[in-house]
Amino acid sequence: MYIHFPQFSPIIFSIFSIPIRWYGLMYFLAFIFALWRGKTRAEYYNLTQIEVENLLYSCFIGLFIGGRIGYIIFYNPVFFFENMSHILKIWEGGMSFHGGLLGVIIVLLFFSKKLNKHILEISDFIVPLVPFGLGAGRLGNFINGELWGRIAPDFKFSVLFPNSREIDLNVAANNLELKSLIEKFGVLPRHPSQIYEFVLEGLVLFFVLNYFSKKSMPFGFVSSIFLILYGCFRIFLEIFRQPDRQIGLFLNTFSMGQLLSMPMIVLGILIAINIYVKVL
């Protein structure tokens, strides 16, 4: 009835006693793809190969720093302020897309002045490269058996994630139906939300953005599509994703991911309106 999640080791192999993890591999592949794809599109955006390399290296630094700081501030400030030594332990998990986005925006502001280009012109170059990284990251989450979805006993394609047992025992404590499921399967069946995110944030967003990036559009248009679509996809997908237990839901309705995605949609719409007004 349900799909049993195959238990993968988070470590693929080791090189000179340095563990190579799935999540790290996904980030590495995302960077290699972005570097390759960015260089093939450089001429269209009047960028040199060196400018592309410097831009992408800087964006990845902004992504990591912003992603980590964003996670600390948005999702778990109390823990990290009480355990400062854990801030640099990125391998233990804890990155925020929205924090990473802010980090990249800061980098783009710097490069827009350095290259004497409008920030939206540079962001139009960057955003088609993003979905591959998003998709790779979600696959990494799935392989690690983390960031699973909400409990879904009535969905026949629900997945049994071994890592969810601790939370599942607490959830099922006062529910006979859920208790019986744990007795039978060990854990509760959940939506494989990482796969949903891989499809929408990775595949669909990749094809849409790369389709429009090949068209002759006013600069800022591709960026507005990215902001609107990602924001809408994230708000929708959070319905299936298990809320972060340390913060739960705001007003018993909205997750942190949904709240942070709302300004993205608003900003994307404002950019699109501005483009429309200028075209007229």
Curated annotation (Swiss-Prot):
Name the EC number(s): 2.5.1.145
What parts of the sequence cross the membrane?
15-35, 60-80, 90-110, 217-237, 257-277
Q: Where is the signal peptide?
A: none
Which residues does the annotation say bind a 1,2-diacyl-sn-glycero-3-phospho-(1'-sn-glycerol)? R138
> What is the annotated localization of this protein?
Cell membrane
Keywords from the UniProt entry: Cell membrane, Membrane, Transferase, Transmembrane, Transmembrane helix
Q: Name one GO molecular function term.
A: phosphatidylglycerol-prolipoprotein diacylglyceryl transferase activity
Q: Which PROSITE patterns match?
A: LGT
Identify the InterPro entries for this entry. Answer: Lgt
One biological process term from GO is: lipoprotein biosynthetic process
User: Any idea what job this protein has?
Assistant: Catalyzes the transfer of the diacylglyceryl group from phosphatidylglycerol to the sulfhydryl group of the N-terminal cysteine of a prolipoprotein, the first step in the formation of mature lipoproteins.
Q: What is this protein called?
A: Phosphatidylglycerol--prolipoprotein diacylglyceryl transferase
Which gene specifies this protein's sequence? lgt
